[in-house]
C-alpha cells in the first residue's frame, strides 16, 4: 500500500499516479501570517487564547484571536491569523507549484470553485493588501494601546485548500481534509487543510478503513481499534464520556489541575 501524506505537496504527488480518482482535484495555496510580540513584559501579562468573531462575510478560518503559545519551550504571544498568498504548496516549496498543478482535468473544477466563492476571493485580496499598520489596527481591538515597535509579522506556514469537482457548481472549495483512495485500495492520499491536531486521529482512522478494509473489518481488527480508541463508533453517553475523559486527564497529568480549578 502507498500512502501519500506530504502536506501541500500531496496534490502534486497524487497527479503522478495513474488512478481515475485523482481527476478533477486541484489546490489553492494560502499562507498563514501572525503578528508576534517582541516585548517580554507584554507576553507575561497574557495567559489565554481569546477569540473574537469573523467579520461580516468573512470565512470561518478568519476568526481573529490573541493566543499564548509555547514555541521551542519559550512562551510567545501571537495575534491573527492573517491570510497571505504564495504560489508555493509548502513553506519552502517552489513558486511554480500552483502552475504545475493546473491541468485540463482540473481547470473546470478550479474555475467553478472561484466563481462560486467570490466573497472568499475578495477577502483574500483584502488580506494580502493589508499593511502592517492595518494589522496593528485589528490588534488594537484586543489591546488598545498596542505599539508597532512591540510587534512583527511572521509567516507561520502554508496550507493548500482542496478543490474538487461538483456536479452543480463545476468545482467546490473544501475547508477540511479529503481522503482519496483508489478502487483497489492500494493508494490513499490525504489532502486539504486540517483545523488542528484534534482531527488527526479521526483522519487516520478513515485512511486505515480505506487502505486496509480486509484487516479493519474483522473481529480482531475491531478489537484492536477499540483498545486504542474506546469511543470509536460508540454511542457516547454521559457515563462513557466521563470515564474516558478521566483516563485522558490521568494520561496527560491534567486531573489534579482541573480539580484545583473547580475548587477555586
Language-model features: locations:
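Active-site substrate-recognition segment that forms the wall
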Residues: 1-122, 127-155, 171-173, 180-182, ...
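C-terminal lid/capping helical subdomain adjacent to the catalytic/cofactor pocket in oxidative enzymes
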Residues: 148, 152-264
